[in-house]
Amino acid sequence: MPKIERAIIMAAGLGNRMHPVTLSTPKPMVKVNGVRMIDTVIDGLHENEIYEIYVVVGYLKEQFVTLEKEYSGVRLIENPYYDTCNNISSLYVAREHIENAIILDGDQIIYNPEILAPEFERSGYNSVWTDGETDEWLQTVENGIVTACSRIGGKGGWQLYSISRWTAEDGKKLKRHLEIEFEQKKNQQIYWDDVAMFCYPKEYQLGIRPMNRYDIIEVDNLSELIALDASYKKYVEEK
């Protein structure tokens, strides 16, 4: 059975939907009830004995330097394209580390570290079964294999979350496909997730990792941040 050896944390984005909080603090470093979001991610990885951790940085990158001092094994990778390209650029600059890796966003809160367990059977995303309507990416799964994915959501499917695992074989493949899309095709405004899911779907047999909805919270905007931590209400009241 494959086992995760390293992690890649995406932390280069601008966090525009969380202005004005993110005007001075990169989104993964924003504190929710006193704890930085990225700390819940790194601590969760450590609980699963994953210590080789690459953090891809861009916007306000200097604020992440403290992580290398606070956590042994954390290394920063700079994404010089963060403000001109979509997040395909972040995985592109970290492409040497995808084999046997778990890839996850730094701007989410991990409530259940078990969802980051290192053992896995096939490459794929942590997912939550959704009966009701959602506008998030929704996967169709047959016999444990993802057979389709809708970018516009739907209902009655597996909602994809930004935690994924990649075998050594699929990691090599994904590295090659990233280079083709980013370097040769200049396809630089897509999500990195598009590469396996939509650009080369026939070359991967992705599975899913079922989890519960409240094992993790993705904080997308200021109103969601306020719902979790009332101390941020002041930003709305100041407007």
Which residues fall in each region the model found?
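Conserved N-terminal catalytic core of the sugar/cofactor nucleotidyltransferase
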Residues: 1-9, 35-100, 184-187
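N-terminal nucleotide-binding beta1-loop-alpha1 segment
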Residues: 1-23
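Conserved alpha/beta core of the MobA/IspD/sugar-nucleotide pyrophosphorylase nucleotidyltransferase superfamily
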Residues: 2-7, 160-239
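Short catalytic helix/loop segments, enriched in acidic residues and glycine
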Residues: 24-38
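Conserved beta-strand segments of alpha/beta enzyme cores
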Residues: 28, 73-75, 205-207
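A structural signal for short hydrophobic beta-strand segments in well-ordered beta-sheet cores
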Residues: 29, 139-141, 208
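Conserved beta-loop-beta/alpha segment of the NTase-like Rossmann-fold superfamily
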Residues: 65, 69-137, 169
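Conserved core of the sugar-phosphate nucleotidyltransferase
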Residues: 112-186
